[in-house]
């Protein structure tokens, strides 16, 4: 059996079982023709072919030759058995059965529902605020006894210098004596009128003999 035939047979079986469970008309083929043949001739023809193939081509289901989409077809295609419930289903509004179950049984009706309590909120302070979110702060009640004087702060005492004053005076005297003993520097010995134009001569003494230890240490780290 091909996969297409298998799914067609499964679809046909499911449609038959669903129809027999929900409808009492007794003939699912007449039901299918009634719903499809008058509006969609191609779908009805396909259903007719499937039915004839499932019947092994040996049984006649009462179909009269003619155009399935034409109103002048078989009587089984255009008429319904007297016990069919299809007309009631066609004229019945959708979800009419469930319209009364949209609300829970304990939900009161609109007339019985209690009106909501409306509380008017004003941005201005009320004259007699009964319930107010931001009440005006009021002074707390104080006793009539005189207020206790505040305790005086401790006077600030400057810390005593750890260096004796005599030692500081002696250091100042030595610095002054050393400053007076130095000879006055003569600018003429260092600079001249042509010092800016003189050629610049350098010697090895002008450079630092030992390199920076930090720089030397960094260079050593890079050596492998």
Curated annotation (Swiss-Prot):
<feature type="region of interest" description="Disordered">
    <location>
        <begin position="128"/>
        <end position="224"/>
    </location>
</feature>
<feature type="compositionally biased region" description="Polar residues">
    <location>
        <begin position="129"/>
        <end position="138"/>
    </location>
</feature>
<dbReference type="Pfam" id="PF02957">
    <property type="entry name" value="TT_ORF2-like"/>
</dbReference>
<protein>
    <recommendedName>
        <fullName>Uncharacterized ORF3 protein</fullName>
    </recommendedName>
</protein>
<feature type="compositionally biased region" description="Basic residues">
    <location>
        <begin position="139"/>
        <end position="156"/>
    </location>
</feature>
<feature type="compositionally biased region" description="Low complexity">
    <location>
        <begin position="185"/>
        <end position="195"/>
    </location>
</feature>
<feature type="compositionally biased region" description="Basic and acidic residues">
    <location>
        <begin position="167"/>
        <end position="182"/>
    </location>
</feature>
<dbReference type="InterPro" id="IPR004118">
    <property type="entry name" value="HEV_TT_vir_Orf2/Gyrovir_Vp2_N"/>
</dbReference>
